[in-house]
Amino acid sequence: MLALALLALALSSCNLARMHGRAVERRLVRHGYTAHTYQADGPHFVWYRNTGKPPLLLLHGYTGTGALQWHKTTALLSKEFDCILPDLLSHGRSAKWDSTRSGLSLDDQAAHIITLLDSLGVRAAVPVVGNSYGGGVAARLAELHPERIERLIIYDGLVSDYSTALADSIARAHGAPSMLAVMRTPTANDLRFGIRLSLYKDPPLPGFLLKQVYREFAAPYRASQITLLKDLMAHESTFVHKRYDWRVPVYLIWGERDELIPNATGRAILERHALPETHWVTIPRTGHVANIERPKAFVAVLRSFLTASPIEP
């Protein structure tokens, strides 16, 4: 529910969802970023700039886009990194070609990212940060292509130790029958469930604004996006207990009050992979999207992990 949470914070009663999306893209352009679409088996879309600074790969969460999730992070890191902001398959401008395609997996997403990196000419290993579903993509990318990843930073990520039973219990606590029902969001009013789960504080949202967000950022993509979650559910027995073969340094960032993917899940990932305690940080007064709720606090933690001398796995 990332894009929905972001828009809930960013839009006021006099704004339109489409206007906000365009404003975000204009800010990226002002910082020197350009949009790239590569036609392989369909459009693979990414924002990127190349000023000679180290590249940093940022992967958005479920329902998000690279621009919507990461524009604040990109601005705060503008003097240090040239960020790579892809739209994952079934999201944003990487979704136009596959609106009816189903069964996309984390491996498909990882291949999509490699296609983009190759197309941009980024061959050296880069640090990758992945939030929520994007955390799962980043985790699999680092496992499949360790030669392309310098370090892995999982941020409130859907990586392992998260079962359908746990997800459904969280959904029921917020008045929904199941997590799949929350993510399916067949009506604009259903977006409220996802927003409550994503944010530390619930913003007051008028119905007309929910309808705008739904029409612009949810309805066109939901049929394809829901297949991403169904793929994870189909492989739940492996996914929940998976111990990744990571050969790069791994760090974890979590929102202190993340109700969507709780801290306990992050701690379980830390312990399952025997990661150092110093590679785990929680950000106070944040939920599932700390980089949106407290962007400066998030970047301070991220910067410390990006510049740290890691304890090798």
Model region roles, listed by residue range:
Residues 1-56, 80-81, 307-313:
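Alpha/beta-hydrolase fold catalytic core
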Residues 50-96:
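Conserved HGGG/HGGXW glycine-rich cap/lid loop of the alpha/beta-hydrolase fold
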Residues 85-129:
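Active-site loop/oxyanion-hole signature of alpha/beta-hydrolase fold enzymes
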Residues 143, 151-186:
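Flexible "cap/lid" loop of the alpha/beta hydrolase fold
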Residues 164-166, 184-244:
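Conserved alpha/beta-hydrolase catalytic His-Asp/Glu region
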Residues 246, 252-254, 258:
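Short beta-strand/loop motif that positions the catalytic acidic residue
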Residues 248, 262-271:
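Short alpha-helix in the alpha/beta-hydrolase fold that links the catalytic acid
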Residues 276-313:
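Catalytic active-site module of serine/aspartate enzymes centered on a nucleophile-bearing elbow/loop
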